[in-house]
Amino acid sequence: MSEPEAKLSKNEQKRLAKQAKKEQERLEKDAAKLNVAVADAPKVVREADPSDPQEYFNMRVRMIEARRAAGDNPFPHKFNVTISLTDFITKYTPLEKEQVVEEIVSVAGRIHSKRESGSKLVFYDIHGEGTHIQIMANAKFHTGDVDFVTLHDRIKRGDIVGFTGRATRTKAGELSLIPNEILQLTPCLHMLPHSHFGLKDKELRFRKRYLDLILNPRVKDNFVIRSKIITFLRRYLDNLGFLEVETPIMNQIAGGATAKPFITHHNDLDMNLFLRVAPELYHKMLVVGGIDRVYEVGRLFRNEGIDLTHNPEFTTCEFYMAYADYEDVIQLTEDLLSSMVMSIKGTYKIEYHPNGPNTEPVYEVDFTPPFKRVHMYDGLAEKLGATLPDPSTLHTEEAREVFDKLCRDNNVDCSAPRTTARLLDKLVGEYLESTFISPTFLIGHPQIMSPLAKWHRSIPGLTERFELFAVTREIANAYTELNDPITQRQRFEQQAKDKDAGDDEAQMIDETFCNALEYGLPPTGGWGMGIDRLSMILTDNNNIKEVLLFPAMRPEDGTEKKTDFDAPTTLA
């Protein structure tokens, strides 16, 4: 049996406790040399920043002018960033509380918040690259020509600032940088909206995307996904042996799609030109020339309406594949999109809110291949419960009258000119397209709706064409290309008649393209997909403006909308 432990006297207990306390104070004092705030010095009473946007703007301009007058450049040419904010977080996340590293690093970012604890300690949150870190500026470690208080008086929310110092983790567990050198890189002249409320006005967000990105950093996520879509597309097609090409944006004839073009004028040639509505005809001429697989990612321009799914300029990917038909292109499309969605989202099934975030209903969109197929003509007849004219007679006036009556009887609106093609398109949109949630191929379009598609090999009057829909919207269009130059010219002539009848979207005869076809286009499958609409689906946005960095906006009486935090860009 061991001897009983000697009991310490009360005095001895007090002595040991006092010694332990002193040791703890010594450790905390040592830690404070790099990490712990010094005791607050008497606060310096400073004038509050103006709340009026114009006065605030003037104050910031005066600060810049005063620095320039003193020979100080308020906009330095260079700051050497040694580590990104993302890498800073990755590298120093393992730090324990109150641990400080010896390594000196330099970071930079935009100030989103500023908090002062007396006159000797200032906290900042700096944002950049979609992330943020805390800066803990302590007067004890400050070096530089400008004194601590003056320097930090200059720095406001919105400024871009560089910091050089050591990484640490505070007592509260916040990963931070303790700077010894601070350089104001770019002053922000305007007051930023309060970070708690952010920027909610959608129209203002779209008009001032730069401010939207500053205050709503998650908006960038939409454009990261958009970029991934385009990168995946290019890599996929490159791996299949396609050649990426560039074709003219200004054309003498607006061909390749049924759409109303933008018109511009070339002064030297003294002629009108059209911004391209589609690159299709150029691509097929390249296939005639022997480039069997071509694709292009680029902007198209259509002088039509602006709404939740349409913008006058938009981005598409088009490809043309010799010795393939629309069945080959269907299989390629299924593989391309299903593998893309899996690569970007990590699953085939995604959720989509057609009425906007956090609303009902919620669609489950399933990109698992194979996709559903619906035959346009048979599907429409079934939905209408009607017998439709034989597809081979759709060019007749009798057929047009049947579809005109169907639209009237079913209250389906169709503005003039009420051609058979336009009437059919409205009926299909109302009764078929509106039901397609998961990816669905709509196949077998009539020839009168598809002037560039090849006739169906077994059903007269129809073509070998498909449109791909998801969440009720068209995202791709493809067909076996018409390569018969005689039939192509006849279809162009019919389109010209429709244009004379008032259809602004009908195509004109393109003699250069017709001549190219006469040299021989091999059997070819062609395909086009809208990048913007696919981006909307994969980012769960119901407004196309959310996936366009700078969407088209209607003017506001010739003046730009002002906000309660805006100020003129000139001194009052």
From Swiss-Prot:
Record bears the keyword Cell inner membrane: no
Residues bound to ATP: R302, N303, E304, H310, N311, E474, I475, G530, I531, D532, R533
SUPFAM superfamilies membership: Class II aaRS and biotin synthetases, Nucleic acid-binding proteins
Keywords noted in UniProt: Aminoacyl-tRNA synthetase, ATP-binding, Cytoplasm, Ligase, Metal-binding, Nucleotide-binding, Protein biosynthesis
Catalytic activity: tRNA(Lys) + L-lysine + ATP = L-lysyl-tRNA(Lys) + AMP + diphosphate
Enzymatic class: ligase
Chain intervals for the UniProt region annotation (Disordered): 1-28
Residues annotated to bind substrate: G256, E280, E318, Y320, N477, E481
Function: Catalyzes the specific attachment of an amino acid to its cognate tRNA in a 2 step reaction: the amino acid (AA) is first activated by ATP to form AA-AMP and then transferred to the acceptor end of the tRNA.
PANTHER family: LYSINE--TRNA LIGASE, LYSYL-TRNA SYNTHETASE
Protein name, per record: Lysine--tRNA ligase
Organism: Caenorhabditis elegans
Name of the gene encoding the protein in the UniProt record: kars-1
